[in-house]
């Protein structure tokens, strides 16, 4: 049974639900997307903004909230890009995590990202895809960028 305000795994409820987004824009004829990064001893690790669904939220509400909290960008959802489900072990517990992603456009940049990340960058699409694939290949977020490109075509 789950007793948290979030859809976060527990020892007895091994499921985790998250949502996030790909914030995109066209600058000087180039498609750009937002990526977050954390500085690690072996270099920067890039990923897309996302976070855990709260019980009183829709997936869309979660995506908008997490994108704003993590990137500092208030964004509007333009479409659904699908989800990934991942099974893994954490602290000896088998977990199932599903993360939903949305295509989003920026409305306002507050300039305040969360303390969990070292930075937020707008990158040209191909560069962002390459960085997502090379720094966090197991997360497969580069595939979400491919879905964004298909969505926009």
Give the ranges of each region predicted by the language model.
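Acidic, metal-coordinating catalytic segment for phosphate/diphosphate chemistry
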Residues: 1-28
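Short, well-ordered beta-strand micro-motif
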Residues: 23, 37, 101-105, 124
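A generic structural motif
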Residues: 24-26, 38-39, 87-89
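Short helix-loop capping/hinge motifs at secondary-structure junctions, enriched
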Residues: 29-30, 109-112
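Conserved Nudix-box catalytic region and its N-terminal flanking loop in Nudix hydrolases
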Residues: 30-73
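Nudix hydrolase/Nudix homology domain
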Residues: 43-46, 111-153
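Active-site segment of metal-dependent pyrophosphate-handling enzymes
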Residues: 68, 72-109
